Every structure is written in C-alpha cells, then in structure tokens.
Regions:
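Short glycine- and acidic-rich boundary segments immediately preceding or forming the N-terminal edge
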Residues: 2-49, 53
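Beta-strand-turn-beta hairpins that frame and shape the catalytic cleft
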Residues: 36-43, 151-160
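Core catalytic region of metal-dependent phosphoesterases/phosphodiesterases
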Residues: 41-45, 50-119
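Active-site-proximal beta-strand elements of phosphoester/diester hydrolases
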Residues: 42-49, 159-165, 226-227
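Divalent metal-coordination and catalytic microenvironments
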Residues: 47, 76, 101-102, 128, ...
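Active-site environment of divalent metal-dependent phosphoester hydrolases
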Residues: 49-53, 79-82, 104-108, 167-169, ...
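Active-site neighborhood of divalent metal-dependent phosphoester bond hydrolases
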Residues: 84-152, 156-158, 168, 175, ...
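Conserved beta-sheet core of the metallophosphoesterase superfamily
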Residues: 185-254
Length: 267
C-alpha cells in the first residue's frame, strides 16, 4: 500500500495517481484535542474491522462504564470482518471516539464516486455490495466528521491516537495543517512498522497509538505503539489497551463467541 505504483520505462516512469492523492474526502477536522479524563478511564482499541463480538466481550472484561469511561479507536472500523454496519453504529455512542482509517477513507471515496466499488471490495468492502448508494453516502457523511488525529490530555500523561504512522513531534501533530503527503502517511503509512522508517524522526512525540499494520503482538517503535493484532484474521485478536495503566486485553472473535459475546449488549 505504501509503495507508489509506477508506469512507463525507467526513463519516463511516472507515478500512477491513487484516489487518496487528492484527499477530496478531507476530514472536517485534522486534529481534535480532548481533556484528560479525570472522572473515569481511557482505553484505545485496535483496528476493529467489523469484529464487534470481540469488542462486546472486551468491554465486559474491562468493566467499561459508559457514564465516565472513553474508548478511542485507531480507525478501520469497517471491512473484512462480519459486522461493518454494527461497527459504524458505534459512531453514535457518546463514549466512542474514532479517527479516520484508510478503510473509512475508501468508503468515502466510493460514496463520492472517486473510487470504483470493485477496488474497495478487493480490500474488504464486499459487505457493502447490497448497501444502497444513499446509505453509503449517509455513512460517508458521518465518517467525514472524524479527525485524522486525536490528542488526549497534556504534559507527561498526554497520548495521541491516529491510524497508520506519523513522523514529527507533538508540535507538528498539533499544528494540524498537514500536507497531502502527511495525510497519506497518517492513513496509509507503513514505513515505521515495517522497519523502513527512521525512529529518530519522531523526537518530541508523546506516546502515540496506531493501527493499520497487523502485528502478532503489541509493538512499540520509539513513541509509536502498534495495536492492530489482526482481529479479522484466523489467528488474530482484537486488542484494547489502557494507556495510563499500561494494561492490555486481547481476544479472538471465535473465543469471544464461545463465551457468548454475540448475546452481550453494547453499553
């Protein structure tokens, strides 16, 4: 995803444009700040990808209190798993705070007519084959309100949430006037997780939770913590972390269903 497709000969080679180059589905807000949660606890969940049953189980396991706790999401609520529309319904929950992921960005591109449905189906969007255009546009309208970055708290307890990766400091992140290259990096970047990025390029960055690149276990590289443990895959799990307490919980969809998660109500 991160390597540019090219066309032509070595002498005339040009970069093939991707739908996300122009970012017509630019979020209404690039970065959103949240005060520290003095009344309850904050959690961050990895790429959900429609695996809502695993989320139901984990919320019960952590005794999530919707009156005072908050759940932040690194994005990619939809595609690949079985319950993408249930995952989108989480956006209406007052305790749920997601950032835009590349799969939500693809949904918006399809709704805008910038991307063919067949391309999206190829990366997991086939659940929407029978979803009318009108409903898809409704989802896109709500997804466009999601920021690319969420900043929680300040000082030593501050942490950031974004989808893929970021190179820069807290000050760079807070500025919010991201270039097209930075926006693509926030949604699609994999340099750091795959070992191709320089960890020193994140000096001055607070603890930052990311998803996008599936990892077998939570992986920290410098300030960035990758928590997409592949919930949709046969050997994957959904992971929730509690930043301040440095705690984590994980479960597979299969194991969650064996525990009756499908019958659990979301808060």
């Amino acid at each position: 995803m991160t390597r540019a497709d090219t066309i032509g000969t070595p002498h005339t080679r040009a970069r093939r444009r991707h739908y996300h180059d122009e970012m017509n589905a630019t979020p209404a807000t690039f970065v959103q700040h949240h005060d520290a949660n003095e009344a309850g606890r904050d959690f961050v969940v990895g790429d959900l990808h429609g695996c809502v049953d695993a989320l139901r189980y984990l919320l019960r396991q952590i005794a999530f209190d919707p009156t005072c706790d908050r759940l932040f999401s690194v994005g990619d609520l939809v595609d690949r798993g079985e319950h993408s529309e249930q995952a989108l319904a989480l956006l209406a929950k007052p305790w749920f705070y997601a950032v835009l992921g590349n799969h939500e960005d693809a949904l918006c591109a399809v709704a805008d007519g910038r991307l063919r449905r067949q391309w999206w189906y190829g990366i997991g969007g086939a659940w929407a084959a029978d979803v009318p255009d009108e409903r898809l546009r409704y989802y896109a309208e709500h997804l466009r309100t999601l920021p690319l970055v969420r900043v929680i708290g300040s000082g030593k307890t501050r942490f950031n949430v974004l989808h893929a990766e970021f190179f820069g400091s807290d000050a760079d992140l807070d500025a919010g006037n991201y270039s097209a290259e930075t926006r693509q990096q926030l949604l699609w970047g994999r340099e750091l997780a795959l070992g191709h990025g320089d960890p020193l390029r994140q000096r001055g960055l607070s603890l930052t939770y990311c998803g996008h690149t599936p990892v077998r276990d939570i992986t920290q590289i410098g300030s960035q913590v990758f928590i997409d443990t592949g919930a949709f895959g046969p050997d994957g799990t959904l992971t929730i972390v509690q930043p301040q307490a440095l705690r984590r919980w994980s479960i597979s969809v299969e194991a969650a269903r064996a525990e009756g998660a499908a019958e659990l109500a979301l808060p």
